[in-house]
Amino acid sequence: MAVARHGYRPWGSILGLLGLALAAAAAWDVASLRCTFGSFCECDFWPDLPGLECDLAQHLAGQHLAKALVVKSLKAFVQDPAPSKPLVLSLHGWTGTGKSYVSSLLAQHLFRDGLRSPHVHHFSPIIHFPHPSRTEQYKKELKSWVQGNLTACGRSLFLFDEMDKLPPGLMEVLQPFLGPSWVVYGTNYRKAIFIFISNAGGEQINQVALEAWRSHRDREEISLQEVEPVISRAVMDNPQHGFWRSGIMEEHLLDAVVPFLPLQRHHVRHCVLNELAQLGLEPSEEVVQAVLDSTTYFPEVEQLFSSNGCKTVASRLTFFL
C-alpha cells in the first residue's frame, strides 16, 4: 500500500509500526532534555501562533470565517495543558479557496519541520485508499497507523484530504480517537489534531455568498450560523462523503466546521500579487490583468466568483510572464 507522506513507510506492517515507535521513543529521550525548558515542546511540536496569524492575514484572501475559526480553535487547544479531546477541524469549500493552503500553514507553524515532520501524516484517497473493495483492509491499517503514531507521539497531526472520495465506512475507525475518552487502545490521544478537507458543502456556501451579494450585504457580514447548517446537511446527505454513517458528525465530534467562501476577482488579484512576490518579481498590472481576464467566473450572468479560486494562478502566471 502507498505511504502517508514523502518517502515510503511500512504503515501496513506491524514490524514497521513497532520500529517507528521504538525510533520515536529513542528520539524522545533526547528531545525531552531540551523540551523541559519549554511549555509546549513535545516531539517536534513548536507552535508559532503569532506567525500563523500573520501568514493568514497576509496571504489568505477573502476568508474571514476560516481565519477566525482556525486561530480561535488552535489558541484554545494549544494553550490547554490537558485538553479534554483532540482538536478536530473539518474544512469545507469550493476548489482553490485555500483549504489545502491553510492545512499546510498549520503544519508549518505547529511543527518545527512542517509537512516534513514525522509527526505530520497526510492522507489522500487516490494514493492511500484507491480501491473501495479493500476498505476493510484499509480500516485495519489506518487504525494501526493512527494508534502506533499516537503511541510514539501524542502531539501528532493527521490530515485527510478529499474526504468526498474516501471509501464509505473507512472513517468509522477514527471515531474512538476523536472523542473525550481518556485512553483508546492503551493510547492517550487527547493532544492530537485531526484535519478533514473536502469540497462538500461548497455549492451551498457559494449560494449563501451569492445571495448575500445580491442583497447588497458585505461579505464579512456572512456568519457561521448561516453556512454551518447547510454544510452539515450537504455532508450528511452525501453517501460518497467520508463522514457518511461514520458517527463522527452524529456524535458531534467536530470542534469546528470551517467554511471557505468563493473568491471574487479582487481576491484572485491578491493571489496573483502574492505569487509574484514569492517569485521575487515586481508586480506588473499588465500581467495581473492578463491572469484575471483568463480566469473563468460564475454564475453565468453575474460573473462574480472564480471557478477555480486561486488554484490555477501559479500555472497561469508562467504563461503570461
UniProtKB/Swiss-Prot annotation:
N-glycosylated. Expressed at similar levels in liver, muscle and brain (at protein level). It holds the Pfam family Torsin. Keywords: ATP-binding, Endoplasmic reticulum, Glycoprotein, Nucleotide-binding, Signal. It is found in: Endoplasmic reticulum lumen. One of its GO terms (molecular function) is ATP binding. Coiled coil: none annotated. Homohexamer. Interacts with TOR1AIP1. PANTHER family: TORSIN (PTHR10760), TORSIN-2A (PTHR10760:SF4). This is Torsin-2A. It comes from Mus musculus (Mouse). The lineage of its organism: Eukaryota, Metazoa, Chordata, Craniata, Vertebrata. The gene is Tor2a.
